[in-house]
Amino acid sequence: MTKLPAHVAVTGRVKDWLKDPESRLPVSCTVFHVKDSMEGKDGIEDSWIFTSRALRNAAGVAIDLSDLRPSGTSNGKGLVASGPCSFAAVYSGLNELLRRGGAFRNGAITLYLNYDHPDIEQYLDLSLDIIPWAKRAVYVDENLMQSPHIDKIVKRVRDGSIWLAKKSYDRQGRRLYSNVCMEILLLSRGTCLLSHGNLGSVTVSEIPQMFEKGMQFLCELHSKTGVGDSGIYLTPEEDRQVGFGVIGLSNLLALEHVKYADFVDALEKVLGYGKETPSEPAYAIACALLEGYSRAAIVARAHNMERAFTIAPTATCSYKYRDRDGYTTAPEISPVNCHPI
């Protein structure tokens, strides 16, 4: 059994799996790119089976519908496509019915469509009455501002009904898909295995080792989860990814009496483009974090991981852990989103 190192905060899924590897899979999220076919591997019906099994294993599911033909399109064989929006309610319904059961099994669904898909306007106008249990997102690229639908896209982003994600590719040119929370990029049928370092529970000098040991734990766990035996997910050999994040940054700053602004100045200085002279405690934290990420990256490369970090941690994970003074750890520092679009 993989031993949990000190100061590593695991997700509930990983914690349950460590107690009982036969109970359910420890991965948090997965993605599925739907091909333009009702039947066959990776087709529409296959995506429903995939979604059902993933939700019943407590995973969030991101579904990319961008390859589906627009509504009203003929396939040349006498069949007319109903379009991606017509299937959206199916995924919402699956989430509503399967999101709970037995042990803690809350699921989540995020639907994706390319901003330049012919049915994008219909997608933007989908009512919550039709898909109450699904979140919507739009894949965008550098040509977004030239879209004839840019005003409506901006409007939907501002009212919170639509999220944006960049089209992404790996070094081999393979398409990567955003997961439910949009913090992890995966190959289709890939999975997201997460754990976090608790910055609030360590001293500054302990940060580098926490990163190194935490990444070692996660990389070793990656090959033991049984995900490859599920029949629906990519195997660990095909899906070379983990997600190591942090919780308790604000706790650490408070414990060390460092203002967030001073920490930012120190981080910029350490990264080589800051102009301000940081305070000594802030500079020490920034240096320790940089060393920690560097040491963790070395571990990840040694395990042939292609991606290894996550920015936004699992929020509910942080509420189960405490800092050095006994206070609940904060998930992250999130300034108010007031950026103009």
Question: Where do the language-model regions lie?
Answer:
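Extended catalytic cores of very large enzyme megasubunits
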Residues: 1-341
